[in-house]
């Protein structure tokens, strides 16, 4: 995934494209994971953010998926808070 992308479009459950603003992109070396934090682009006042994991297949194609594992999510949340505190 390009690290300098400002917006991405994702498909919802109904197959419709929704535009998201990329808040930040980061890696966690300890668990060999890449993550992106996004928020809906249409609603600038939305406090809701989504953390997605970047998964690459054997051909190098990337897919964004939600994080199901609670321990992984806790590590990602901690890393995100650190990244955001460094940006302040």
From Swiss-Prot:
PANTHER family: UPF0473 PROTEIN CBO2561/CLC_2432, UPF0473 PROTEIN CBO2561_CLC_2432. It comes from Clostridium botulinum (strain Eklund 17B / Type B). This is UPF0473 protein CLL_A1177. Belongs to the UPF0473 family. It comes from the Bacteria. Coiled coil: none annotated.
């Amino acid at each position: 995934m390009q690290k300098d992308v400002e917006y991405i479009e994702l498909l919802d459950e109904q197959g419709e494209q929704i535009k998201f603003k990329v808040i930040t992109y980061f890696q966690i070396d300890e668990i060999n994971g890449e993550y992106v934090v996004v928020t809906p682009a249409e609603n600038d006042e939305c406090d809701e953010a989504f953390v997605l994991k970047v998964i690459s297949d054997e051909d190098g194609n990337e897919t964004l998926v939600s994080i199901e594992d609670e321990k992984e999510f806790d590590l990602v949340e901690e890393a995100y808070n650190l990244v955001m505190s460094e940006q302040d």
